[in-house]
Amino acid sequence: MTGCVNSISPPPVTLYRHRASPSRSSFSLSGDALHSLYRHRRVSRSPSIIAPKFQIVAAEKSEPLKIMISGAPASGKGTQCELITHKYGLVHISAGDLLRAEIASGSENGRRAKEHMEKGQLVPDEIVVMMVKDRLSQTDSEQKGWLLDGYPRSASQATALKGFGFQPDLFIVLEVPEEILIERVVGRRLDPVTGKIYHLKYSPPETEEIAVRLTQRFDDTEEKAKLRLKTHNQNVSDVLSMYDDITIKIEGNRSKEEVFAQIDSSLSELLQERNTAPSSLLS
């Protein structure tokens, strides 16, 4: 899932940014000022080239990246998160994985979470918010930066995270047609030994030995997928309104390399703007 191509010319990224001028009459070199500068500058996108081998990119003399990625079930978030974390060294935090681990533990919260997930409903905030908060607060997340996958899924969850002081630098949205999403979900399989995700059609297992041990997640049936999509569609606009000035929308119905090229272009430019911001402010 970390494959790449030599050269990709990505399609234009639809970028949504707040155009109002900063309210402050002057800037300092604080984190708030740098974040404000990024949010209010006009951004131009240029094609990104994916090298044959990724190298970790560090943001010198700046705060670590804080990224959120959102999309409907099977929109490709997991694949893109692997590519992003491999290149940028961020800590990948999947709300779904946190919930599934809680369910596997047999705890009361896990039992309650499973009941809601089986119905295609959002897990109550009081269960999941603290799980995500605790993971974001761990040392590795604070030092390396984080990539929050599939969360927040409602305006109330976004508000709770903001109240705890967690604000992303960029909010990435993957958009894929619904019929393709259903096909992706139903054909998805999990290797319980390695944790790797396969797809019976698009990414089949390498050997028969792996094929016979694959399992389907309990929430990956067509019926539950449709319920989850309905819930996602009902909540996504409210979430986007919380991050409209830092949101980029990516067409996810492309090859993983093409999708990553668009994301990589945005992240690389964000790092470049951060690293050049001090000299710009002093000039």
Swiss-Prot record:
Q: Give the residues the record marks as binding AMP.
A: 100, 121-123, 150-153, 157, 217, 228
- Protein EC: 2.7.4.3
SUPFAM superfamilies reported in the protein's UniProt record: P-loop containing nucleoside triphosphate hydrolases
Any single GO CC term annotated in Swiss-Prot or TrEMBL for this entry: chloroplast
Among PROSITE patterns, the record links this protein to: ADENYLATE_KINASE
The cross-references to InterPro entries, in alphabetical order and at most eight, read: Adenyl_kin_sub, Adenylat/UMP-CMP_kin, Adenylat_kinase_CS, P-loop_NTPase
Q: For this protein, what reaction is catalysed?
A: AMP + ATP = 2 ADP
Cite the binding residues for ATP.
Answer: 74-79, 188
Q: What class of enzyme is it?
A: transferase
Instruction: Tell me which UniProt keywords the record has, alphabetically.
Output: ATP-binding, Chloroplast, Kinase, Nucleotide-binding, Plastid, Transferase, Transit peptide
Specify where the region named NMP lies, as residue ranges.
94-123
Entry GO MF terms: adenylate kinase activity; ATP binding
Q: Report the leader peptide range.
A: none
Primary residence: plastid
The UniProt annotation puts the region (LID) at 187-220
Give the family, as the similarity comment puts it: Belongs to the adenylate kinase family.
| Subunit-structure text | Monomer.
State the protein's name: Adenylate kinase 2, chloroplastic
Name the species this protein comes from: Arabidopsis thaliana
